[in-house]
Amino acid sequence: MSRPVPNPGILDIAPYTPGKSPVAQPGRKVFKLSANETPFGPSPHAIAAYQSAADHLEDYPEGTSRVLREAIGKTFGLDPDRIICGAGSDEILNLLAHTYLAPGDEAIATTYGFLVYPIATMANGAKLVIAEEKNLTCDVDAILAKVSPNTKLVWLANPNNPTGTYIPFDEVRRLRAGLPEHVVLVLDGAYADYVAKNDYETGIELVSTTENTVVCHTFSKIHGLAALRIGWMFGPANIVDAVNRIRGPFNTSVPAQLAAVAAIKDTAHVEMSRAHTIQWRDRLTEEFTKLGLTVTPSVCNFVLMHFPQTAGKTAAEADAFLTQRGLVLRGLNNYGLPHALRMTIGTDEANELVIAALREFMAQP
C-alpha cells in the first residue's frame, strides 16, 4: 500500500521540544521555570483589551494588523508600512525562510542558535550550515567563513537563547558589511528587552540603512503574551513586500492585536519586569557560582548553569532533584548541552527555592 511521502528533508527535521510543563504535585506548589515566561503575566491593560474582543468574535481581523503596526511604529519611531505582524515571531521566521530559501540554498546559524532555525530552513529544502561559537557566543568571523555562493540567509539571535549571550552592535555591523548584499541577515531580538549593555542595539539602524536586514521581536517574553502568539518584524520595503505576498491575510487574531497594543503602551509594567530580571540575574549568577557551578554570563531573563560530570552532581540528576521539589527547569540535551540547565528567572519565591534546593543538592556527598 502506498502512502503520501513528505518533501525531501522533512523527515530529517528534529521536532521542536518545548520546555517541560509542570505536573501537579499534591501538597506542593509547582514553579515552571523552563520556558522563559515572565513571572508577572501580562499588563492588566492587555488583559482588559483581550477580554474586550469577546464582543465581536464573529468579525475577521483587519488583515494587516494596522492598529498594532501603528502602535509599534509610534513606540519605536518606525514606519508602520515597514512592519509585519505574525502569530509569534516564529511565524515570521518561517515566512522569511519560505520567501528566501529553496532547495540548493544554504542558511547559516550558530552552534547553539534557536531550534526553530533548522526547522524553518530544512522545511524549505535548504541546508543549514553551522558556524561554531566561541565561549558560547556568536563568532562573526566563523559565520563569514561559512559563506558560500549558495548562502541566502543568516540567522542571528542577539541575544541568544539558550546561552543568554550577545554580541555588541559593532560586531553586528561588521557581520552585515562582510556578507554579500544578496544575503538576508535576520536579527532575532526576542530577548532584546532584557539587555542592559551600552554596546548593544537591536539592529534597527541597519534595517533603516540597508535592503537586506530585518529585525524580529516578540510579545511572548517581557510583555507576557506567549499564549496569544503575536510578534513583529521591521524590515526594508522590498523584503516586507515579498513576505506580505505569502503571509496569510488574517494571520493575527483580534484578541492578540488588541492585547499587544495595550501591552506596548504599558511601559511601567515593562520596566518593572526588566528591573526584577536584572536584579535577580545578578543575584542568581552570584549564588550559583558560589555553589561551584559555572554560569554563562546572561543578558536575558534566564541563566545557563553548567554542572560537573561527576556522578551525583550531574545536570540530569540536578534536574530530577529540582523537579521532585516542584521546580521545573530546562534540560538542554536537544541543544547539545547535556551538562547544563537553563533557569527562567521567576518570582522572588521561586528563585529563592531554586537557590536553596541547589545548595542542598550540591552539598550531598
Swiss-Prot record:
Pathway membership: Amino-acid biosynthesis; L-histidine biosynthesis; L-histidine from 5-phospho-alpha-D-ribose 1-diphosphate: step 7/9
One of the record's GO molecular function terms: pyridoxal phosphate binding
GO biological process, one term: L-histidine biosynthetic process
Listed EC numbers: 2.6.1.9
Keyword set, alphabetical order: Amino-acid biosynthesis, Aminotransferase, Histidine biosynthesis, Pyridoxal phosphate, Transferase
Region listing for Disordered, in residue ranges: 1-22
Cofactor(s) needed: pyridoxal 5'-phosphate
Catalyzed reaction equations: L-histidinol phosphate + 2-oxoglutarate = 3-(imidazol-4-yl)-2-oxopropyl phosphate + L-glutamate
Keyword rRNA-binding among UniProt keywords: no
Residue numbers bearing the N6-(pyridoxal phosphate)lysine modification: K221
SUPFAM superfamilies: PLP-dependent transferases
Organism domain of life: Bacteria
InterPro entries membership: Aminotransferase_I/II_large (IPR004839), HisP_aminotrans (IPR005861), HistidinolP_aminotransfase (IPR050106), PyrdxlP-dep_Trfase (IPR015424), PyrdxlP-dep_Trfase_major (IPR015421), PyrdxlP-dep_Trfase_small (IPR015422)
Entry similarity comment: Belongs to the class-II pyridoxal-phosphate-dependent aminotransferase family. Histidinol-phosphate aminotransferase subfamily.
Subunit annotation: Homodimer.
Protein name, UniProt field: Histidinol-phosphate aminotransferase
Gene symbol of the encoding locus: hisC
